[in-house]
Amino acid sequence: MFVALSHLGRVGLLWLLLALGAAILWRRADIFALTFAAYAAAEASSQLLRRLFDRDRPPVADPHPEPLVSTPGDPAFPSGHATTSFACAVVLAWLTPLHPVPLFVVAALVAFSRVYVGVHYPLDAVSGAVVGLAIATALRLLVTGRRRSGPAPPAG
């Protein structure tokens, strides 16, 4: 199960398909657009932070036991799967009538799957979740702040 979850979390496929389905179901293109924006920002942030911290993955630090999936060649901290999963789960919980608990359970399982399959330390997954939450929160503040402020009133 965790190997499958690890693969589903790859390239945001699970989240982007869920966002596309929600956008079609509720006829709201912003659901997909903002979920995609959260995914892209989360992916870019995790890549930047990985280069900054340059932390080895468990198989590099200790090659025994063998990981259950192929080990990515990039650094580990934070987990990109956790970052993108939590960013997308928060956006979907915010924009849709879907109950947030299952979204966060799936995000947590994807994050845990990366530890279970042996390609991340627990801190990588937890840090990814925190970064994902921060990105989604920033996106929400950006969008709701823009909606609230709206265009300037005409000069009087």
Residue ranges of model-derived segments:
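Membrane-water interface at transmembrane helix exits
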Residues: A22, S46-R50, D54, A93, ...
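Interfacial segments of alpha-helical transmembrane regions
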Residues: L17-S45
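N-terminal transmembrane-helix/juxtamembrane module of multi-pass inner/ER membrane proteins
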Residues: M1-W15, S46-D74, P151-G156
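Alpha-helical transmembrane segments
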Residues: L8-G12, F32-F36, H99-V105
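Membrane-embedded catalytic cores of phosphoryl/pyrophosphoryl-handling enzymes
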Residues: L18, P63-G156
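Small-polar-interrupted transmembrane alpha-helices in polytopic inner-membrane proteins
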Residues: F36-L52, V101-S113
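Membrane-helix interfacial "entry" motifs
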Residues: V3, A23, R27, I31, ...
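Short helix-capping/hinge motifs at transmembrane helix termini and TM-loop junctions
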Residues: R10, L25-W26, F53-D54, P97, ...
